[in-house]
A protein has these predicted regions:
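N-terminal Sec-pathway targeting helices
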Residues: 1-16
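An N-terminal hydrophobic leader/cap segment in hydrolases
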Residues: 15-56
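Membrane-embedded segments
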Residues: 63-135, 139
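Primarily recognizes the serine-hydrolase "nucleophile elbow" in alpha/beta-hydrolase
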Residues: 135-186
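Active-site nucleophile elbow and catalytic-triad environment of alpha/beta-hydrolase enzymes
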Residues: 188-202, 208
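Short beta-strand/loop motif that positions the catalytic acidic residue
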Residues: 205-207, 212-214, 218
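Conserved alpha/beta-hydrolase "acid-adjacent" motif
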Residues: 219-225
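C-terminal catalytic histidine-bearing segment of alpha/beta-hydrolase fold enzymes
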Residues: 227-270
Length: 270
């Protein structure tokens, strides 16, 4: 019996050590798990954005880099908040469509992503997001916010702190820590995760009309995140759920055809 007790104790201690090691690994490597910034910087000259320009925007003690195109007269400007991977320029086909339909845009890399130097953190991303909005506001056009995936967090935060015409959230999380808890249900992510992006709290202060777009086939951020976040919006406009669509499928699925009338409705409001 004594031997069995010792074996049981040893197994318990081993389980504790393994669990502690898993928690320690997550804590030490959490930003490497959360962000995928590596990738090429797309040259503006290699796109069809003939009237866009490269811009450098002061943000905190550094700066962020992006592209800007002014809207057609009387049209609004989309401030675009990218996801957690690679560089903003890889989505140039979206910006080309915005411009073709008369919309202006500002898109950029958060600090620590390919086009903008620095270290990645939630505080830095939120500071960059506000700096981009404030820079765009100085241009004088009405502003529309579009946040995709990770970008839904800073877009929601900015909408809670500034006045825009509309907030579009594409494949958003309820919060980043919600997604982490879904992926690692046996780890105390609420205690150890630094960059939690609590959109579920920020959205309470969002007065702009909100469109949430998501797909039922999204295995990166489950569609329930978008549905739950939309339910919390004080000024919900529309919820667009695409059957079978994955995390990166909504542009091809026609999100722009949903976004344009949403933006037009928002612009028509006083």
């Amino acid at each position: 019996m004594k031997l069995l007790g010792r074996v049981a104790l040893a197994l318990i201690l081993l389980a504790i050590l393994l669990y502690g090691g898993a928690v320690g690994y997550m804590y030490a490597n959490q930003r490497a798990l959360q962000y995928e910034p590596a990738g090429p910087v797309i040259a503006l000259a290699d796109t069809a954005l003939a009237n866009a320009e490269e811009v450098t925007i002061p943000a905190g003690e550094g700066s962020i880099h992006g592209w800007y195109a002014a809207p057609a007269p009387g049209m609004p400007l989309i401030v675009y908040y990218k996801g957690n991977a690679r560089s903003f320029g890889e989505e140039h086909e979206r910006y080309e469509r915005f411009v073709a339909d008369g919309y202006g845009f500002l898109a950029f890399d958060y600090r620590g992503f390919p086009a903008s130097p620095g270290a990645i953190s939630q505080d830095g991303i939120l500071e960059d997001a506000l700096a981009a909005f404030d820079w765009a506001a100085e241009r004088g056009a009405p502003l529309l916010l579009w946040g995709r995936s990770l970008g839904s967090g800073p877009a929601t935060y900015v909408a809670s702190q500034r006045e825009a015409k509309a907030l579009l959230l594409e494949t958003p999380f309820l919060s980043a820590v919600t997604v982490a808890a879904e992926r690692y249900p046996y780890l105390p992510v609420h205690w150890v995760m630094q960059d939690q992006f609590r959109s579920n709290e920020w959205i309470a202060a969002v007065t702009e009309p909100v469109l949430v777009a998501h797909g039922t086939g999204d295995v990166t951020i489950d569609v329930s995140n978008g549905e739950r976040l939309y339910a919390l919006a004080p000024n919900p406009d529309s919820l667009w759920i695409v059957p079978g669509a994955g995390h990166s499928d909504l542009w091809a699925a026609g999100i722009w055809a949903e976004a344009k009338p949403f933006f037009e409705r928002a612009m028509a409001r006083q």
